[in-house]
Amino acid sequence: MRAHPSRAYLLRDMFVPYNVAPNSNTLGTIEAPPRAVPQDAVLALLSPAIPGTLLAGLVTVTAALLGSAFAAGMARNMAGAALPAQLAVALFVPWNPFVIERLLQGQWTVATAGMLLPAVAYLAAAGRHARGLLFLLICSCSLTPTGAIFAAVTVAVFSPSTRARLMNLFACALAASPWILHALWSAFAASGADEAQMAGTFTDPASASAFAARAEESVGTLGALMGLGGIWNAEAVPHSRGTFATVAGVILCLLLFLGFKELWRVYQPAAIVTVAAIALPAVFATAPGIAAMEWLLAHVPGFGLFRDTSKFVALAIPGYVLLMATVTQQFSRSNRPVTFGRLTPRFLSTVMAGIFAGLAVATVPAYPAEMKPLKPVALSAAWDQIHNAVACAPAGKTLLLPPGSYRDRDGRPAISPALKLLPGSPIDPGFLVVDGKVVDGDAATIALLKDLLAGENTLRTSGVSWVLVDWESVQDPADMSGAMEVLNSPGIHESVALDGYTLYRVNNPELVDHVPSLLQKAPTLLGLMLYWIVSSAGLALWAQSTARTFIHQAHARPRPTPRP
């Protein structure tokens, strides 16, 4: 986990460098909905002191350890299971297809949120005495909007009273306020806008089918989801996840549901959420479900957050932990079926826990080796020169070519490093190419890119100060002919050319109408402030609770009896 300034985590949706630039993308002060706030904002604010790569690694490892520890606590204190079951659930939390596939997709904060859900569930059930650490973990989950939803659903299910539930949900809302306030502001601003501006608050309905849960070999869509898999991107599926692995996931799920009756009796809301987390993504992967999702994306602002339905199988993780412990505990009872003969309850429960652990491992049998793509990679030396050039005049926007936010260098598809390395305002066009189809996208940026590729120079009037071309990501140089006519015209000059990157400077861009005002930045900045307040409150409450515990234990120790 040792950090090096020239290396970064770079894979698909993930780019975490040593230092994250506090630009308009990472701080979420762009007009478009912020995609990775407060995740990138936290990295940008802390990376001068703690390297971003080190911080990301620490968060991921800590989430795995906490999730495993509290999963064992759930098995012990909420289901009465013995040590073998506790070890099985502790293994299951980091070793399941959801966590592994999301890490390989580059959604590391989504994966960490999923691993933290057993801890969130346990602390929510523990009541007010555990509230400090609970608030901290809610903020950790809320590094991504998806994680905030995970945390909100989990505390709603496991909080012991209505008052505790409302307080915990309020903390979730405050932790998620960086993107909630931005979404509300965007909806309010768009209410009086024209149709083109209004479209920016909705998601392309064509993306519904692209992001639907994916069927897996031999088990179909429902079977994939039962095993906590089914991610939409087949390239993010571990190579070892073949027929044996998918069938193992289905068998694991079927064995777990032997304890469903008991889970329904004791934790009915958890049982409902567990079933819904599997069933609803399967429904939205059918033709009627995709049609319903298309309608929701076209008519409900911000619903794009829910189109990747397979990620919500993470909500089943706390339920799976309880079911695993419950089934194991059922085999440890003295009134076991006579068919087991003279086998002791302890032996049977140990065997059952071993079966669960073995099936969890079998769902991704080559897990450690599958993480090889997540190793930090060396960044091009060109980025230092590009950063220094842009830093000399950070006002204005930096346009990225070829069009799109993602790059493919050395066979490694990943989000463009420019979005998190460069100061100022690197432009994220916001569109994705999924299965050859273009979905989403900021209308103004797409129009600007179309003009440039057609040979029309609207850069200066659009507030663009820099244009960065990544030639190794250009599939057909002929497609760049129109853009090169513009970039070689008077008023634009080459600033940096190194390692397949070329940076162009646009002279005298019109910046007045293209720099976000303080009013436009206010919702996200206020949200970030509220996020830090909740984090600080959680840290203070946790420190106070820990200090009280130590003091109480110190006073409770028996004092030695003085000799007569």
Residue ranges of model-derived segments:
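Membrane-interface coil-to-helix junctions
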Residues: 1-67, 91, 95-103, 108-112
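Membrane-interface helix-loop junctions at the exits of transmembrane helices
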Residues: 2-7, 84-106, 177-191, 214-231, ...
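Periplasmic/ER-lumenal interhelical loops and adjacent helix-loop junctions
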Residues: 19, 23-25, 42, 177-258, ...
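Membrane-helix boundary/interfacial segments in multi-pass membrane proteins
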Residues: 25-26, 98-111, 239-243, 271-323, ...
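Membrane-embedded helix bundles of polyisoprenyl
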Residues: 64-78, 84-160, 165-180, 355-363, ...
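Signature aromatic-anchored transmembrane alpha helix within multi-pass, membrane-resident enzymes
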Residues: 83, 173, 328-364, 527-535, ...
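Extracytoplasmic
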Residues: 192-199, 359-564
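Hydrophobic, aromatic-rich transmembrane alpha-helices
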Residues: 226-233, 243-278, 534-549
